[in-house]
A protein has these predicted regions:
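Glycine-rich phosphate/pyrophosphate-binding loops
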Residues: 34-46, 199-212, 233-247, 461-466, ...
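Conserved phosphate-binding loops in nucleotide/dinucleotide-binding enzymes
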Residues: 83-87, 110, 189-190, 208-219, ...
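Active-site cores that bind ATP or allylic diphosphates and position pyrophosphate for catalysis
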Residues: 102, 107-242, 248-254, 262
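Charged substrate- and nucleic-acid-binding regions of tRNA-handling and nucleotidyl-transfer enzymes
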Residues: 426-488
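Residue-level signal for inorganic ion chemistry
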Residues: 29, 60, 100, 104, ...
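Small-residue-rich helix-loop
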Residues: 336-439
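N-terminal Rossmann-like or analogous alpha/beta NTP/dinucleotide-binding catalytic cores
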Residues: 2-125, 222-235, 275
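Structural motif
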Residues: 18-20, 266-274, 313-319, 352-360, ...
Protein backbone atom coordinates (compact mmCIF):
# COMPACT_ATOMS: atom_id res chain seq x y z
CA UNK A 1 0.00 0.00 0.00
CA UNK A 2 1.22 3.59 -0.60
CA UNK A 3 2.74 4.80 2.66
CA UNK A 4 2.16 8.52 2.15
CA UNK A 5 -1.64 8.41 1.82
CA UNK A 6 -3.96 8.46 4.83
CA UNK A 7 -6.06 5.29 5.07
CA UNK A 8 -8.65 4.93 7.82
CA UNK A 9 -11.18 2.21 8.55
CA UNK A 10 -14.52 1.90 10.30
CA UNK A 11 -14.75 -1.69 11.52
CA UNK A 12 -18.11 -2.32 13.23
CA UNK A 13 -19.43 -5.65 14.49
CA UNK A 14 -22.88 -6.56 13.09
CA UNK A 15 -24.81 -6.57 16.37
CA UNK A 16 -28.08 -5.07 15.16
CA UNK A 17 -28.08 -1.30 15.58
CA UNK A 18 -25.83 1.72 15.34
CA UNK A 19 -24.87 3.19 18.71
CA UNK A 20 -24.44 6.95 18.85
CA UNK A 21 -20.82 6.25 19.89
CA UNK A 22 -20.29 3.92 16.91
CA UNK A 23 -21.65 6.49 14.49
CA UNK A 24 -19.35 9.13 15.99
CA UNK A 25 -16.37 6.80 15.43
CA UNK A 26 -17.47 6.29 11.81
CA UNK A 27 -17.82 10.05 11.33
CA UNK A 28 -14.41 10.92 12.81
CA UNK A 29 -12.81 8.12 10.77
CA UNK A 30 -14.45 9.44 7.60
CA UNK A 31 -13.47 13.05 8.36
CA UNK A 32 -9.86 12.06 9.05
CA UNK A 33 -9.58 10.36 5.66
CA UNK A 34 -11.43 12.97 3.63
CA UNK A 35 -9.71 15.98 5.22
CA UNK A 36 -6.38 14.47 4.15
CA UNK A 37 -7.70 13.43 0.72
CA UNK A 38 -7.23 9.83 1.83
CA UNK A 39 -9.20 6.57 1.71
CA UNK A 40 -12.09 5.59 4.00
CA UNK A 41 -12.52 1.82 4.34
CA UNK A 42 -15.46 -0.18 5.69
CA UNK A 43 -14.56 -3.54 7.25
CA UNK A 44 -17.09 -5.85 8.91
CA UNK A 45 -15.70 -7.57 12.03
CA UNK A 46 -17.91 -10.63 12.43
CA UNK A 47 -15.54 -13.09 14.13
CA UNK A 48 -17.76 -13.18 17.25
CA UNK A 49 -20.55 -15.31 15.79
CA UNK A 50 -22.33 -15.43 19.16
CA UNK A 51 -23.17 -11.72 18.89
CA UNK A 52 -23.98 -11.75 15.17
CA UNK A 53 -27.48 -10.45 14.36
CA UNK A 54 -29.16 -11.27 11.05
CA UNK A 55 -29.70 -8.11 8.98
CA UNK A 56 -27.23 -6.08 11.04
CA UNK A 57 -24.82 -5.61 8.13
CA UNK A 58 -27.64 -3.91 6.21
CA UNK A 59 -28.19 -1.58 9.20
CA UNK A 60 -24.51 -0.58 8.95
CA UNK A 61 -24.70 -0.03 5.17
CA UNK A 62 -27.97 1.93 5.39
CA UNK A 63 -26.83 4.14 8.27
CA UNK A 64 -23.58 5.11 6.58
CA UNK A 65 -25.34 5.78 3.27
CA UNK A 66 -28.10 7.85 4.93
CA UNK A 67 -25.53 9.97 6.76
CA UNK A 68 -23.35 10.43 3.67
CA UNK A 69 -20.36 8.55 5.10
CA UNK A 70 -19.63 6.73 1.86
CA UNK A 71 -16.73 4.30 1.85
CA UNK A 72 -14.06 4.01 -0.84
CA UNK A 73 -13.35 0.32 -0.22
CA UNK A 74 -15.60 -2.23 1.45
CA UNK A 75 -17.44 -5.56 1.30
CA UNK A 76 -19.96 -4.54 -1.35
CA UNK A 77 -17.67 -2.55 -3.64
CA UNK A 78 -14.39 -4.39 -3.10
CA UNK A 79 -10.93 -2.88 -3.32
CA UNK A 80 -7.25 -3.82 -3.54
CA UNK A 81 -6.94 -5.40 -0.06
CA UNK A 82 -10.15 -7.46 0.28
CA UNK A 83 -12.03 -9.37 1.36
CA UNK A 84 -13.44 -6.73 3.71
CA UNK A 85 -15.44 -9.13 5.91
CA UNK A 86 -13.34 -10.72 8.65
CA UNK A 87 -15.01 -14.15 8.48
CA UNK A 88 -13.96 -14.32 4.80
CA UNK A 89 -10.31 -13.77 5.79
CA UNK A 90 -10.06 -16.72 8.20
CA UNK A 91 -7.34 -18.60 6.35
CA UNK A 92 -4.71 -15.91 6.78
CA UNK A 93 -4.64 -15.31 10.55
CA UNK A 94 -3.31 -18.66 11.71
CA UNK A 95 -0.24 -18.47 9.49
CA UNK A 96 0.70 -15.15 11.08
CA UNK A 97 0.26 -16.59 14.58
CA UNK A 98 2.37 -19.63 13.64
CA UNK A 99 5.04 -17.28 12.30
CA UNK A 100 5.25 -15.70 15.77
CA UNK A 101 5.45 -19.16 17.37
CA UNK A 102 8.36 -20.07 15.07
CA UNK A 103 10.14 -16.86 16.09
CA UNK A 104 9.57 -17.45 19.84
CA UNK A 105 7.14 -14.53 20.16
CA UNK A 106 4.05 -16.70 20.74
CA UNK A 107 3.39 -20.22 22.01
CA UNK A 108 0.92 -23.10 22.01
CA UNK A 109 -1.11 -23.33 25.22
CA UNK A 110 -2.84 -26.62 26.07
CA UNK A 111 -4.46 -25.54 29.35
CA UNK A 112 -8.06 -26.73 29.65
CA UNK A 113 -11.02 -24.53 30.54
CA UNK A 114 -11.23 -26.38 33.87
CA UNK A 115 -7.62 -25.56 34.75
CA UNK A 116 -8.06 -21.90 33.82
CA UNK A 117 -11.29 -21.62 35.82
CA UNK A 118 -9.61 -23.13 38.90
CA UNK A 119 -6.60 -20.82 38.44
CA UNK A 120 -8.77 -17.72 38.20
CA UNK A 121 -10.88 -18.77 41.20
CA UNK A 122 -7.71 -19.13 43.27
CA UNK A 123 -6.43 -15.74 42.09
CA UNK A 124 -9.73 -14.07 42.98
CA UNK A 125 -9.69 -15.72 46.41
CA UNK A 126 -6.22 -14.22 46.96
CA UNK A 127 -7.45 -10.78 45.90
CA UNK A 128 -5.42 -10.87 42.67
CA UNK A 129 -6.42 -9.78 39.17
CA UNK A 130 -7.12 -12.87 37.08
CA UNK A 131 -4.36 -13.63 34.60
CA UNK A 132 -2.71 -16.53 32.82
CA UNK A 133 0.18 -17.96 34.85
CA UNK A 134 2.39 -18.92 31.90
CA UNK A 135 2.09 -22.68 32.51
CA UNK A 136 2.70 -23.54 28.82
CA UNK A 137 4.94 -20.57 28.04
CA UNK A 138 8.24 -22.47 28.10
CA UNK A 139 7.25 -26.05 27.27
CA UNK A 140 10.05 -28.02 25.55
CA UNK A 141 9.69 -28.12 21.77
CA UNK A 142 9.48 -31.94 21.77
CA UNK A 143 6.57 -31.94 24.22
CA UNK A 144 4.71 -29.34 22.16
CA UNK A 145 5.16 -31.35 18.96
CA UNK A 146 4.05 -34.55 20.70
CA UNK A 147 0.87 -32.93 22.07
CA UNK A 148 0.07 -31.34 18.71
CA UNK A 149 0.54 -34.69 16.96
CA UNK A 150 -1.84 -36.29 19.48
CA UNK A 151 -4.51 -33.79 18.47
CA UNK A 152 -4.68 -32.11 21.87
CA UNK A 153 -6.76 -28.89 21.76
CA UNK A 154 -4.75 -25.68 22.04
CA UNK A 155 -4.79 -21.93 21.75
CA UNK A 156 -1.93 -19.73 20.58
CA UNK A 157 -0.89 -17.07 23.09
CA UNK A 158 1.26 -13.98 22.61
CA UNK A 159 4.53 -14.15 24.58
CA UNK A 160 4.48 -10.77 26.32
CA UNK A 161 7.92 -9.68 27.62
CA UNK A 162 8.07 -10.04 31.42
CA UNK A 163 10.31 -7.00 31.90
CA UNK A 164 10.43 -3.41 30.70
CA UNK A 165 7.64 -1.10 29.59
CA UNK A 166 5.65 -0.66 26.41
CA UNK A 167 4.72 2.89 25.49
CA UNK A 168 2.70 4.51 22.76
CA UNK A 169 1.61 7.98 21.69
CA UNK A 170 -2.02 8.90 21.30
CA UNK A 171 -3.18 12.10 19.58
CA UNK A 172 -5.75 12.74 22.33
CA UNK A 173 -4.25 11.22 25.49
CA UNK A 174 -0.56 11.84 24.83
CA UNK A 175 2.20 9.38 25.79
CA UNK A 176 1.08 6.32 27.75
CA UNK A 177 3.32 3.62 29.22
CA UNK A 178 2.41 0.24 30.72
CA UNK A 179 4.67 -2.15 32.61
CA UNK A 180 4.98 -5.35 30.59
CA UNK A 181 4.65 -7.35 33.83
CA UNK A 182 1.05 -6.05 34.13
CA UNK A 183 -0.01 -7.49 30.77
CA UNK A 184 -1.45 -10.95 30.24
CA UNK A 185 -0.26 -13.38 27.57
CA UNK A 186 -3.32 -12.75 25.40
CA UNK A 187 -4.82 -15.42 23.17
CA UNK A 188 -4.26 -14.87 19.44
CA UNK A 189 -5.91 -18.01 18.00
CA UNK A 190 -8.76 -19.76 19.84
CA UNK A 191 -9.25 -23.54 20.10
CA UNK A 192 -11.61 -23.47 17.10
CA UNK A 193 -8.89 -21.88 14.96
CA UNK A 194 -10.64 -18.50 14.91
CA UNK A 195 -8.56 -15.41 15.69
CA UNK A 196 -9.39 -13.23 18.67
CA UNK A 197 -10.71 -9.75 17.98
CA UNK A 198 -7.42 -8.10 19.00
CA UNK A 199 -5.25 -10.28 16.79
CA UNK A 200 -7.44 -10.09 13.69
CA UNK A 201 -7.62 -6.34 14.20
CA UNK A 202 -3.85 -5.86 14.07
CA UNK A 203 -3.31 -8.22 11.13
CA UNK A 204 -6.11 -6.64 9.10
CA UNK A 205 -5.03 -3.07 9.86
CA UNK A 206 -1.51 -3.88 8.67
CA UNK A 207 -2.56 -5.75 5.52
CA UNK A 208 -5.02 -2.99 4.62
CA UNK A 209 -2.39 -0.27 5.08
CA UNK A 210 -4.33 1.56 7.80
CA UNK A 211 -2.39 4.69 8.84
CA UNK A 212 -4.76 6.14 11.47
CA UNK A 213 -6.78 4.08 13.97
CA UNK A 214 -9.73 5.96 15.51
CA UNK A 215 -11.65 4.17 18.26
CA UNK A 216 -13.10 4.52 21.75
CA UNK A 217 -10.91 5.12 24.80
CA UNK A 218 -11.92 1.68 26.16
CA UNK A 219 -9.26 0.30 23.79
CA UNK A 220 -6.44 2.31 25.40
CA UNK A 221 -5.62 -0.58 27.75
CA UNK A 222 -5.32 -3.04 24.80
CA UNK A 223 -3.11 -0.77 22.71
CA UNK A 224 0.24 -1.79 24.30
CA UNK A 225 -0.54 -5.41 23.34
CA UNK A 226 -1.35 -4.26 19.81
CA UNK A 227 1.98 -2.45 19.66
CA UNK A 228 3.90 -5.50 20.87
CA UNK A 229 2.32 -7.42 17.98
CA UNK A 230 3.30 -4.73 15.48
CA UNK A 231 6.84 -4.81 16.88
CA UNK A 232 6.96 -8.63 16.83
CA UNK A 233 6.12 -8.61 13.12
CA UNK A 234 8.30 -5.59 12.38
CA UNK A 235 5.30 -3.67 11.06
CA UNK A 236 4.78 0.10 11.10
CA UNK A 237 2.58 1.25 14.00
CA UNK A 238 -0.39 3.43 12.97
CA UNK A 239 -1.30 6.80 14.49
CA UNK A 240 -3.71 6.28 17.38
CA UNK A 241 -6.68 8.56 18.07
CA UNK A 242 -8.73 7.38 21.05
CA UNK A 243 -12.05 9.15 21.69
CA UNK A 244 -13.71 9.72 25.07
CA UNK A 245 -16.86 7.75 25.89
CA UNK A 246 -20.33 9.14 25.21
CA UNK A 247 -22.14 9.29 28.56
CA UNK A 248 -25.81 9.43 29.48
CA UNK A 249 -24.81 11.33 32.62
CA UNK A 250 -21.74 11.68 34.85
CA UNK A 251 -21.93 8.02 35.98
CA UNK A 252 -23.44 6.02 33.12
CA UNK A 253 -22.30 5.35 29.56
CA UNK A 254 -24.88 5.67 26.81
CA UNK A 255 -26.10 2.13 26.23
CA UNK A 256 -28.74 0.55 24.00
CA UNK A 257 -29.22 -2.12 26.68
CA UNK A 258 -30.37 0.62 29.06
CA UNK A 259 -32.88 1.89 26.52
CA UNK A 260 -30.78 4.81 25.28
CA UNK A 261 -31.41 5.96 21.74
CA UNK A 262 -29.50 4.51 18.81
CA UNK A 263 -29.16 6.41 15.53
CA UNK A 264 -32.17 4.48 14.17
CA UNK A 265 -34.26 5.42 17.22
CA UNK A 266 -33.48 9.12 16.81
CA UNK A 267 -34.44 9.11 13.12
CA UNK A 268 -37.62 7.16 13.95
CA UNK A 269 -38.51 9.89 16.47
CA UNK A 270 -38.28 12.50 13.75
CA UNK A 271 -34.77 13.89 14.12
CA UNK A 272 -33.13 14.87 10.82
CA UNK A 273 -30.14 12.78 9.77
CA UNK A 274 -28.01 15.87 9.11
CA UNK A 275 -28.83 17.29 12.55
CA UNK A 276 -28.00 14.02 14.32
CA UNK A 277 -24.66 13.81 12.50
CA UNK A 278 -23.86 17.46 13.29
CA UNK A 279 -24.68 16.95 16.98
CA UNK A 280 -22.77 13.68 17.25
CA UNK A 281 -19.68 15.37 15.81
CA UNK A 282 -19.77 17.89 18.67
CA UNK A 283 -19.90 15.11 21.29
CA UNK A 284 -16.31 15.32 22.49
CA UNK A 285 -14.96 17.45 19.63
CA UNK A 286 -14.95 21.19 19.09
CA UNK A 287 -13.71 23.28 16.17
CA UNK A 288 -10.88 25.77 16.61
CA UNK A 289 -10.09 29.30 15.47
CA UNK A 290 -12.66 31.19 13.44
CA UNK A 291 -15.13 28.28 13.75
CA UNK A 292 -14.92 28.00 17.55
CA UNK A 293 -18.31 29.66 18.15
CA UNK A 294 -20.10 27.95 15.25
CA UNK A 295 -22.39 24.97 15.94
CA UNK A 296 -24.11 24.19 12.65
CA UNK A 297 -21.88 22.42 10.11
CA UNK A 298 -22.63 20.53 6.91
CA UNK A 299 -20.63 17.38 6.24
CA UNK A 300 -18.45 19.13 3.58
CA UNK A 301 -17.75 21.92 6.10
CA UNK A 302 -16.70 19.36 8.72
CA UNK A 303 -14.36 17.71 6.19
CA UNK A 304 -12.78 21.09 5.50
CA UNK A 305 -12.18 22.13 9.14
CA UNK A 306 -11.57 18.71 10.72
CA UNK A 307 -8.63 18.25 13.06
CA UNK A 308 -8.26 15.48 15.67
CA UNK A 309 -6.66 18.11 17.93
CA UNK A 310 -10.22 19.23 18.72
CA UNK A 311 -11.08 15.92 20.44
CA UNK A 312 -11.39 16.22 24.22
CA UNK A 313 -10.12 13.73 26.82
CA UNK A 314 -13.22 14.32 28.95
CA UNK A 315 -16.29 12.09 28.58
CA UNK A 316 -19.00 13.63 26.41
CA UNK A 317 -22.46 13.92 27.98
CA UNK A 318 -25.32 13.24 25.56
CA UNK A 319 -27.60 16.26 25.95
CA UNK A 320 -31.08 15.69 24.42
CA UNK A 321 -31.94 19.40 24.72
CA UNK A 322 -28.86 20.37 22.71
CA UNK A 323 -29.73 17.81 20.02
CA UNK A 324 -33.26 19.24 19.98
CA UNK A 325 -31.98 22.79 19.52
CA UNK A 326 -29.69 21.76 16.65
CA UNK A 327 -32.51 19.76 15.04
CA UNK A 328 -34.85 22.77 15.29
CA UNK A 329 -32.23 24.94 13.58
CA UNK A 330 -31.93 22.41 10.73
CA UNK A 331 -35.73 22.36 10.35
CA UNK A 332 -35.81 26.16 10.15
CA UNK A 333 -33.14 26.10 7.42
CA UNK A 334 -35.14 23.77 5.15
CA UNK A 335 -36.92 25.28 2.16
CA UNK A 336 -40.75 25.21 2.51
CA UNK A 337 -40.85 22.42 -0.10
CA UNK A 338 -38.21 20.34 1.71
CA UNK A 339 -40.00 20.77 5.03
CA UNK A 340 -43.36 19.72 3.59
CA UNK A 341 -41.80 16.62 2.03
CA UNK A 342 -40.30 15.59 5.40
CA UNK A 343 -43.38 16.60 7.45
CA UNK A 344 -46.09 14.98 5.29
CA UNK A 345 -45.56 11.38 6.53
CA UNK A 346 -46.03 12.66 10.10
CA UNK A 347 -49.04 14.80 9.15
CA UNK A 348 -50.65 11.80 7.44
CA UNK A 349 -50.42 9.80 10.68
CA UNK A 350 -52.78 12.25 12.38
CA UNK A 351 -54.88 13.88 9.66
CA UNK A 352 -57.19 11.86 7.43
CA UNK A 353 -59.42 14.70 6.22
CA UNK A 354 -58.76 17.16 3.43
CA UNK A 355 -56.70 20.15 4.62
CA UNK A 356 -54.36 22.74 3.10
CA UNK A 357 -51.03 21.03 3.86
CA UNK A 358 -48.96 23.81 2.35
CA UNK A 359 -50.45 26.37 4.74
CA UNK A 360 -50.23 23.92 7.65
CA UNK A 361 -46.52 23.34 6.95
CA UNK A 362 -45.87 27.08 6.67
CA UNK A 363 -47.24 27.38 10.21
CA UNK A 364 -45.56 24.23 11.55
CA UNK A 365 -42.03 24.91 10.30
CA UNK A 366 -41.12 27.88 12.57
CA UNK A 367 -42.56 26.09 15.62
CA UNK A 368 -41.37 22.51 14.99
CA UNK A 369 -38.34 21.11 16.84
CA UNK A 370 -38.79 17.37 16.19
CA UNK A 371 -40.87 15.98 13.31
CA UNK A 372 -42.19 13.13 15.47
CA UNK A 373 -44.06 15.63 17.64
CA UNK A 374 -46.19 16.87 14.73
CA UNK A 375 -49.04 14.30 15.02
CA UNK A 376 -49.92 15.20 18.62
CA UNK A 377 -50.41 18.84 17.56
CA UNK A 378 -52.91 17.93 14.84
CA UNK A 379 -55.36 15.57 16.53
CA UNK A 380 -58.22 18.11 16.27
CA UNK A 381 -58.41 18.11 12.46
CA UNK A 382 -60.17 14.74 12.14
CA UNK A 383 -62.55 15.25 15.06
CA UNK A 384 -63.27 18.12 17.41
CA UNK A 385 -62.07 17.18 20.92
CA UNK A 386 -64.11 17.75 24.06
CA UNK A 387 -63.16 21.03 25.74
CA UNK A 388 -64.37 23.32 28.50
CA UNK A 389 -65.73 26.77 27.63
CA UNK A 390 -63.47 28.25 30.34
CA UNK A 391 -60.75 27.90 27.68
CA UNK A 392 -62.18 30.99 25.98
CA UNK A 393 -61.06 33.16 28.91
CA UNK A 394 -57.79 34.95 28.10
CA UNK A 395 -56.59 38.00 30.03
CA UNK A 396 -54.16 39.13 27.34
CA UNK A 397 -56.82 39.06 24.61
CA UNK A 398 -59.47 40.37 27.06
CA UNK A 399 -61.84 37.52 26.24
CA UNK A 400 -64.35 35.55 28.31
CA UNK A 401 -66.83 32.83 27.32
CA UNK A 402 -69.44 35.60 27.00
CA UNK A 403 -67.33 37.80 24.71
CA UNK A 404 -66.27 34.70 22.75
CA UNK A 405 -69.91 33.99 21.89
CA UNK A 406 -70.30 37.59 20.75
CA UNK A 407 -67.11 37.36 18.62
CA UNK A 408 -68.08 34.07 16.96
CA UNK A 409 -71.58 35.35 16.15
CA UNK A 410 -69.97 38.42 14.54
CA UNK A 411 -67.60 36.23 12.52
CA UNK A 412 -70.25 33.83 11.24
CA UNK A 413 -71.58 36.08 8.43
CA UNK A 414 -68.00 37.09 7.47
CA UNK A 415 -66.93 33.45 7.09
CA UNK A 416 -70.23 32.53 5.37
CA UNK A 417 -69.68 35.05 2.57
CA UNK A 418 -69.39 33.00 -0.64
CA UNK A 419 -67.13 35.69 -2.14
CA UNK A 420 -64.49 35.05 0.55
CA UNK A 421 -61.74 32.80 -0.84
CA UNK A 422 -60.54 30.35 1.86
CA UNK A 423 -57.61 29.52 -0.40
CA UNK A 424 -56.30 33.05 0.21
CA UNK A 425 -55.19 33.29 3.84
CA UNK A 426 -54.50 37.04 3.67
CA UNK A 427 -57.97 37.75 2.30
CA UNK A 428 -59.62 35.81 5.14
CA UNK A 429 -57.45 37.59 7.72
CA UNK A 430 -58.23 41.02 6.22
CA UNK A 431 -61.98 40.30 6.30
CA UNK A 432 -61.79 39.29 9.98
CA UNK A 433 -59.60 42.32 10.76
CA UNK A 434 -62.15 44.63 9.11
CA UNK A 435 -64.89 43.13 11.29
CA UNK A 436 -62.77 43.73 14.43
CA UNK A 437 -62.26 47.37 13.41
CA UNK A 438 -65.99 47.75 12.77
CA UNK A 439 -66.67 46.48 16.31
CA UNK A 440 -63.94 48.69 17.78
CA UNK A 441 -62.05 45.62 19.04
CA UNK A 442 -58.49 44.31 18.68
CA UNK A 443 -57.87 41.40 16.32
CA UNK A 444 -57.14 39.00 19.18
CA UNK A 445 -60.53 39.63 20.77
CA UNK A 446 -62.13 38.23 17.63
CA UNK A 447 -59.59 35.65 16.45
CA UNK A 448 -58.57 33.99 19.73
CA UNK A 449 -62.10 32.55 20.18
CA UNK A 450 -62.05 31.40 16.53
CA UNK A 451 -58.91 29.33 17.20
CA UNK A 452 -60.55 27.67 20.24
CA UNK A 453 -63.79 27.05 18.33
CA UNK A 454 -61.93 25.30 15.50
CA UNK A 455 -59.51 23.23 17.60
CA UNK A 456 -60.62 22.99 21.23
CA UNK A 457 -57.00 23.82 22.10
CA UNK A 458 -55.14 26.88 23.33
CA UNK A 459 -51.95 26.00 21.43
CA UNK A 460 -52.27 25.22 17.73
CA UNK A 461 -50.08 25.32 14.60
CA UNK A 462 -51.48 28.65 13.45
CA UNK A 463 -54.00 31.26 14.53
CA UNK A 464 -57.75 31.25 13.96
CA UNK A 465 -57.69 32.43 10.34
CA UNK A 466 -54.87 30.00 9.50
CA UNK A 467 -56.88 27.09 10.91
CA UNK A 468 -59.99 28.22 9.02
CA UNK A 469 -58.05 28.28 5.73
CA UNK A 470 -56.46 24.89 6.45
CA UNK A 471 -59.87 23.30 7.15
CA UNK A 472 -61.89 25.09 4.49
CA UNK A 473 -65.23 26.88 4.64
CA UNK A 474 -67.51 23.88 5.32
CA UNK A 475 -65.66 22.53 8.37
CA UNK A 476 -65.00 26.03 9.68
CA UNK A 477 -68.66 27.05 9.61
CA UNK A 478 -69.80 23.76 11.16
CA UNK A 479 -67.37 24.15 14.05
CA UNK A 480 -68.12 27.84 14.64
CA UNK A 481 -71.87 27.05 14.79
CA UNK A 482 -71.20 24.14 17.19
CA UNK A 483 -69.10 26.44 19.39
CA UNK A 484 -71.85 29.07 19.56
CA UNK A 485 -74.30 26.33 20.56
CA UNK A 486 -71.85 25.10 23.22
CA UNK A 487 -71.48 28.65 24.59
CA UNK A 488 -75.28 29.02 24.66
CA UNK A 489 -75.33 25.74 26.64
Amino acid sequence: MPSNKVRTRFAPSPTGYMHVGNLRTALYTYLMAKHEDGTFILRIEDTDQGRYVEGAVDVIYNTLRETGLLWDEGPDIGGPVGPYVQSERMGMYKQYAEQLVAEGKAYYCFCTEERLEALHAEQRANGEMTHYDGCCRDLPKEEVEKRLAAGEPYVIRQKIPREGVTGFDDVVYGHIEVNNSEMDDQILIKTDGMPTYNFANVVDDHLMGITHVIRGSEYLSSTPKYNLLYQAFGWEIPTYIHCPPVMKDAQNKLSKRNGDASYQDLVAKGYLTEAVLNYICLLGWSPKGEYAEQEIFSLPELVKIWSPDGISKSPAIFDPLKLRAINAEYIRRLSPEEFQKKAEPWIDKAVHTSIDKKLLCANLQPRCEVLGEIPEQLDFFDAMPEYDVSMYANKKQKTTPETAKEALEALLPVLSDEALDFGNRDAVFDACKAKAEELGKKNGWLLYPLGIALSGKQRTPGGGTDLACMMGRETTLARVKAAIEKLNG
